[in-house]
């Protein structure tokens, strides 16, 4: 059986999805000869496959187009494991991500050895369905196979799987402490099939970024998505009015994003046409944004400065940068205003907020008492989650707290902001919207204040409910279920053939008394004996069963996962 391992691209696909560093993701090869029996249907289906692969190789921005073509081929043959695998991968990129599960399970059931990362991908698909216990099982199975078979080129997946396992455990806790907030995508024409994010409410107008475009519009070389454009919309009586694209003087081939008001005339913008990406000041002249000077006290030559927020007082500015010396990929920094014309040097906000992973964006409340940011660290339940912390009396920011479910999801949740009427906005890549990132909004819930007799009622600041990261009672049942579901079985394979073997031929190979199990996988009839809980036990029986070329195979739930060549350290 010929197998093509396409590991590296898939790993980095899910690590770097939002960083713009993706290159060369590859799919599994779908053979024309084995695709379908009918000649005319075979040609048509394979034409869809070839076109899908060609588009996919351009960049992840074309993944939705590739997915549609793969699905057209799937209608002509729904049992090809490589095709089902490729459809699953495209769903994990283009969404809805939970739709990937059935295709990946189908691929794995037909060919358990379809790909070295199949259980990692199945784990992701379960995770996006909020089925965290089954996701953990498959992430652990992925680790087990890497360790068992000593796949050196896949060692990078071990810490990534551990990270996903921890996120799934966080997710179970957060789901168990979910709030009653009902979230809906913002109404009107704001959201589209493309990415919409970074909602900023200035005066009476909602500004937001979108990567929508027409087929012939220019695309970013990083990911082959359309460049970010700035739009605005005014709210009518019952819904948002038609959107309007904001013009600027930087040209078309640039990402352009508005963040915060700097002073009475100028606003803080991000532009990708300077270095790795810098923050600029700009002001509106008639119907066009005129880009001014780069913010020199923030920008560095070799780093990317993105996301900025300024409280109403104007005496601080918070921003995100990937400059050297931080705790992780991107950290949150701040500068203080020292005079009308001078700002302090950037200071890292510290290790209680920044993590070894990635902080993506930042927002400070108008009164400067609350900080919101997205992070892949802390107790995130998947990708970026949104966190908040309060400024203490001594001016230091308190411990970050996860905003909880349903504000956060198992997908990426980013770019939180608030307006002056007590409504919060954020962008999420979760399913249920129009596609990609969609913008959601909801009224900030009023705090519940209990009446205390004979004592004054204290005014509590308006906050969004937060969720504690600890809840032992919720974790107990899923943990037991997790232990049950991750049960592995080792067997000894004594023979394999393309055709069903005669009993006498099997007896000539194996003369012992163990029951022989017959399994048909990917065109091969495989014969195994024994059920052992550890590799050591199985290997001992393999060496004593009398079949010289016997070997140990790992099973889970009746499925053959692959060869087991050496003991797993956990045993």
Tell where the protein language model's regions lie, with residue ranges:
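Structural marker of alpha-solenoid helical repeat scaffolds
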Residues: 76, 110-111, 145
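Canonical positions in the second alpha-helix
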Residues: 73, 106-108, 142
């Amino acid at each position: 059986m010929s197998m093509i391992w396409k590991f590296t691209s898939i790993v980095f696909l899910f690590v770097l999805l939002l960083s713009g560093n993706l290159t060369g993701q590859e799919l599994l090869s779908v053979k024309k000869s084995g695709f379908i029996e009918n000649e005319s249907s075979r040609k048509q289906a394979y034409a869809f496959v070839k076109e899908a692969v060609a588009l996919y190789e351009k960049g992840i921005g074309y993944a939705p187009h590739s997915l549609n073509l793969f699905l057209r081929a799937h209608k002509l043959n729904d049992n090809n494991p490589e095709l089902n695998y490729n459809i699953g991968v495209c769903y994990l990129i283009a969404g809805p991500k939970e739709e990937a599960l059935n295709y990946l399970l189908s691929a794995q059931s037909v060919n358990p050895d379809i790909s070295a990362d199949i259980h990692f991908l199945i784990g992701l698909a379960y995770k996006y369905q909020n089925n965290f216990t089954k996701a953990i099982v498959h992430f652990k199975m992925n680790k087990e196979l890497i360790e068992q078979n000593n796949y050196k080129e896949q060692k990078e997946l071990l810490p990534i799987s551990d990270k996903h396992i921890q996120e799934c455990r966080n997710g179970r806790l957060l789901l168990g402490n979910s709030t009653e907030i009902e979230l809906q995508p913002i109404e009107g024409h704001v959201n589209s099939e493309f990415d919409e994010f970074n909602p900023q409410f200035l005066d009476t107008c909602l500004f937001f970024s979108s990567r929508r475009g027409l087929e012939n519009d220019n695309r970013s070389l990083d990911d082959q998505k359309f460049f970010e454009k700035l739009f605005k919309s005014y709210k009518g009586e019952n819904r948002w009015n038609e959107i309007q694209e904001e013009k600027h003087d930087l040209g078309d081939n640039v990402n352009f994003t508005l963040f915060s008001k700097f002073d009475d005339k100028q606003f803080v913008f991000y532009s990708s046409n300077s270095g790795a990406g810098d923050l600029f000041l700009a002001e509106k002249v008639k119907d066009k944004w005129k880009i001014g000077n780069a913010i020199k006290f923030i920008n560095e030559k070799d780093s990317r400065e993105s996301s900025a927020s300024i409280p109403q007082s104007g005496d601080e500015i918070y921003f995100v940068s990937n400059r050297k010396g931080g705790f992780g990929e991107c950290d949150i920094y701040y500068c203080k205003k020292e005079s009308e014309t001078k700002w302090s040097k950037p200071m890292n906000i510290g290790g209680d907020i920044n993590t070894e992973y990635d902080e993506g964006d930042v927002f400070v409340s108008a009164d400067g008492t609350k900080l919101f940011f997205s992070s892949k660290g802390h107790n995130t339940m998947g990708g970026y989650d949104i966190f908040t912390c309060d400024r203490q009396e001594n001016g230091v920011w308190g411990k970050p707290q996860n905003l909880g479910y349903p504000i956060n999801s198992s997908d990426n949740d980013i770019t939180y902001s608030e307006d002056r009427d007590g409504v919060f906005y954020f962008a999420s890549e979760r399913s249920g919207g129009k596609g990609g990132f969609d913008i959601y909004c909801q009224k900030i819930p009023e705090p519940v204040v209990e009446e205390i007799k004979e004592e004054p009622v204290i005014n509590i600041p308006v906050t969004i409910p937060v969720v504690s990261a600890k809840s032992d009672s919720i974790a107990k049942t899923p943990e037991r279920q997790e232990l049950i579901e991750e049960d592995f079985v080792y067997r000894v394979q004594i023979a394999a053939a393309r055709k069903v073997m005669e009993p006498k031929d099997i007896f000539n190979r194996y003369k012992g008394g163990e029951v022989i199990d017959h399994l048909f996988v990917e065109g091969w009839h495989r014969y195994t004996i024994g059920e052992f809980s550890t590799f050591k036990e199985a290997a001992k029986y393999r060496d004593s069963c009398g079949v010289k070329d016997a070997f140990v195979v790992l099973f889970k739930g009746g499925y053959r996962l692959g060869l087991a060549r050496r003991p797993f350290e956990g045993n």
